[in-house]
């Protein structure tokens, strides 16, 4: 699993997320969702400080290399039985970990169309 991501704040323009990039900084994806958000805030505040001090030069985005993500729907948070055959424990752990509040919680459909929501999971090879 990729344990790092790149934060790329940009200047707003007429498009959505299409303006020039102010800076790019790698940050860690290790930990729960709250610690990842806190890390984003720290990395982002470093960039804002840099921008306000005049240390950043806006660079146009390469729209050919841009990636796009749609907003998650609650249905995308379902974990199906086939996932347990197709993914490792760490991959399922990461799906549950990234789908915490404020995102739709991950769930497993049970008998009677009820849902078992997964709020926290752990991977443990010692059991």
Q: What is each residue range found by the language model?
A:
Residues 1-71, 75-79:
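Donor/substrate-binding cores of folate-linked one-carbon enzymes
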Residues 60-127:
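Internal anion-binding site segments
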């Amino acid at each position: 699993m990729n344990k790092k991501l790149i934060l790329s704040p940009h200047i707003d323009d007429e498009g959505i997320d299409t303006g020039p990039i102010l800076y790019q900084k790698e940050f860690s994806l290790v930990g729960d969702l709250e610690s990842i958000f806190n890390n984003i805030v720290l990395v982002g505040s470093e960039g804002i400080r840099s921008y306000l001090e005049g240390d950043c030069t806006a660079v146009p985005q390469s729209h050919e290399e841009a990636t796009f993500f749609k907003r998650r729907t609650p249905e995308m948070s379902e974990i199906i039985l086939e996932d347990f055959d197709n993914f490792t424990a760490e991959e399922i752990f990461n799906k549950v970990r990234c789908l915490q509040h404020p995102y739709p919680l991950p769930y497993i459909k049970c008998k009677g169309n009820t849902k078992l929501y997964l709020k926290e999971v752990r991977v443990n090879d010692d059991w």
